[in-house]
Amino acid sequence: MNKLIYYFGNNGSDGNASMNNILGNKGAGLAEMSNLKLPIPNGFTITTELCNYFYKHNNNFPKNFQNELQQAISKLEVTTGKIFGSTTSNPLLLSVRSGSTVSMPGMMDTILNLGMNNEVCNALADACGNKLFALDSYRRFLEMYGSTVLSIPSDLFEQIYENHKIQADIYKDSDITVELLEKIIDDFKRLHIKYDKQLINDPYEQLESAIKAVLYSWKNNRAIIYRKLNNISEDFGTAINIQEMVFGNLGKTSATGVAFTRSPSTGEKKLFGEFLINAQGEDIVSGTRTPMPIIANDSNSMQAMMPEVFKELSQIAKKLEEHYLDMQDIEFTIENNKLYILQTRTAKRTAIAAINIAVQMVKEKLISKEQALMRIDPESLNQLLHTRIDYSKGLTSIAEGLPASPGAATGIVVFSPYDAEKLSHHHKVILVRHDTSPEDINGMHVSSGILTIRGGMTSHAAVVARGMGKPCVCGTNNLSIDEQKQILIAGDIVIKQGDIITIDGGSGKIFLGEMPLIQPTFSEESKLILDWADEISSLKVRANAETVNDALVSIKFGAQGIGLCRSEHMFFDKNKIPLVREMIIAPDIERRQCALQKLLPLQTEDFKSLFRVMKNKPVNIRLLDPPLHEFLPTTEEDKKNLANSLNLPLSMIHQRLHAMHEVNPMLGHRGCRLGICLPEIYQMQIEAIFTAIFELHKKEHIESNLELMIPLISNVAEIKKLKMYIYEVVQELEQRYSYKFSFTLGTMIELPRAALESKKIAKEVDYFSFGTNDLTQTTYGISRDDIASFLPYYLEEKIFESDPFTTLDEEGVGELIEIAIKRGKSSNANLKLGACGEHAGNPTSIAFFHKANLNYVSCSPYRIPIARIAAAQAKIKQGS
């Protein structure tokens, strides 16, 4: 078996920072600090290989491990001049800490002051001349060992401790006496015996039990949950770091604390942190005492109280940051005015701090732009783009669903789009529905947030909300709506229309009442790092947008064009929907043409507004795609209004609606099939688009950059048929206006057959745009609106590694995309390639699109900054 124990300390180290995989983060950091000659407590690291062996061999150690451990302790005794378990001279006490290869703060176990018993406690008191300190250390050991190794509930120790303080009329820990500590220790021992039938006094037995406890903690519930949430492998295992104890609880010249080399909240370049005098590390973490700042303008700071130690800590912090070239999180102890560094690691930080620090370090010439970009978590930019809940206030949610669209919103509950529109004039509203449909668009538009009982991360509500930049929570199966009573039920809680709730689209949590919110910020540093991303990336980022507001937001966030304009979204405007319904219900082509002619000028103005804002940036307009039933009324009141407006009997409306019913409309009469069977619809749209282009050119001297896209192709014959229709209309308009139009023609590749037939299809078009939402649906045979009913189980059982509608399935859907690219390029070398599904805003999927040599991705406006960073990171990682 490989070497299991690596030494570190004042005499150097067996390891270094590059050995993270076997020494863990903490052990590698201690080894590196030893090599930098920094003051650290001497010790050794037991490698992650022991953890893996332990779990593979029925929780047993390798044969020679105990001998190696005793040799390591002997070496530590020589180095420190202290004896482990000594009852006559200065005894060696140990700390035993976990150390995963990936930082998992607070998830695994630690034992301090190990090696204590009655005789060792007396020897320690004699050696330092401080019995109160020795007893305090013994008390701490019994509590930590009892709760960690023996699984005694920690609150039982806390109760004993607090009861003794109350009986002695003592309220501050600093006033505790030797006599009181002796009573507390006696009760702690009795608690050990009650749970374990014995008191473990042998230091080596304590050490072996502590090592096992740390190994067991690798698979405790909180560690398992943390790894799942953060995608950390179970196979890494944990290292164990064993060090001589240094004591921050020796009196007024001793302390413990945590320091950051820069502010983890803002990134400001100054030492930031807290410390406690006469304390050990768990006192800061537990919150039982209020720590003091390291730097402050008053006498309670370390800078004022311990100026020499503060100066040394500042120098070490600077040295560590310059060595690791990143902000550091440093744990330290001060023993009788001597500073010891216990740990350094890359510090966690907010999104704004990450950006500010990255920009600062480039300007300080510590790192390159590429390194700066790799420091940014693309998803963390959601913090900058959306309002979020201030969780520091300690809040309790009433329910939880899927985090479908980030941001937080507070408002009164409404149950219909009509009520949302009516009440939004005077209140912020949260639209609560079983699910949403395109008909709800106006209600969604005026709502501050959207909550649906059904649906997943790519449901209609989720997709539209992300496009609008509105918070949305979907799939809240622990909520129910009683539509007759107009109430929302969460367990025993009944929420009526008009009651206030808060939703968090970033976590999926729902709260009763108004929660404290933090407003978003977008700094100059944020803009600068996004500019660096654009300099580096080869993959362009466009927006999915069809309104002027969408387009303006997209430009603000750096979109290089519109990659998907869903023209049908324009039809849901309240001024247009009656005409659209009239066109659909019309019993003959003459009446349909009449309705289309009324729609024509309205569509023309829509397109003019979009082209005007985009100013010659590419605008990719998809012709009408969804099935027509989505535009039709669902309530009796709306059906009556439609009948009256068309001067038709209500029975005929019902008859037409029944005739248009489809069992599976998403695979039915939609997309290019509509354009072929009802060519007058596409002809109206084409006339509106090209008329808008001509009028902007002639009247406003604005040139447009049109890309025209045909949806849901499965057969090259469909392209040929629609291409003929399109060019007939364009040629007629060119003659009418005496103007030559310039545009490119493309198609969506969103059906497996289209991907397989792409060689033929590519000959007829200028570009492909991969519609990965429908391509995923039709490849898997899974409805994105219904996946929420089984996805959690599939993820838990590892049937799916991730939600295929969030992260692109590279093996199945990805292979179809690669086939389409290869075959398409073989017949059309100049074929341009884009992607416009929800995956186009997902960093992992963007890495795939970069590798596949796409020209652009197109995502919802509020995903654009995330996509820009992810595109640059993909280029940096893949080196091309």
UniProtKB/Swiss-Prot annotation:
Sequence segments annotated as region (N-terminal): 1-348
The keyword Phosphoprotein is assigned to this record: yes
Catalysis: reaction(s): pyruvate + phosphate + ATP = phosphoenolpyruvate + AMP + diphosphate + H(+)
E.C. numbers: 2.7.9.1
Region named Linker 1: 349-405
Annotated SUPFAM superfamilies: Glutathione synthetase ATP-binding domain-like, Phosphoenolpyruvate/pyruvate domain, Phosphohistidine domain
Positions bound to ATP: 97
Residues reported to bind Mg(2+): 750, 774
PANTHER family named among the record's database cross-references: PHOSPHOENOLPYRUVATE DIKINASE-RELATED, PYRUVATE, PHOSPHATE DIKINASE 1, CHLOROPLASTIC
Function (record text): Catalyzes the reversible phosphorylation of pyruvate and phosphate.
Misc. comment: The reaction takes place in three steps, each mediated by a carrier histidine residue located on the surface of the central domain. The two first partial reactions are catalyzed at an active site located on the N-terminal domain, and the third partial reaction is catalyzed at an active site located on the C-terminal domain. For catalytic turnover, the central domain swivels from the concave surface of the N-terminal domain to that of the C-terminal domain.
Protein name from the UniProt record: Pyruvate, phosphate dikinase
Organism from which the protein derives: Rickettsia prowazekii (strain Madrid E)
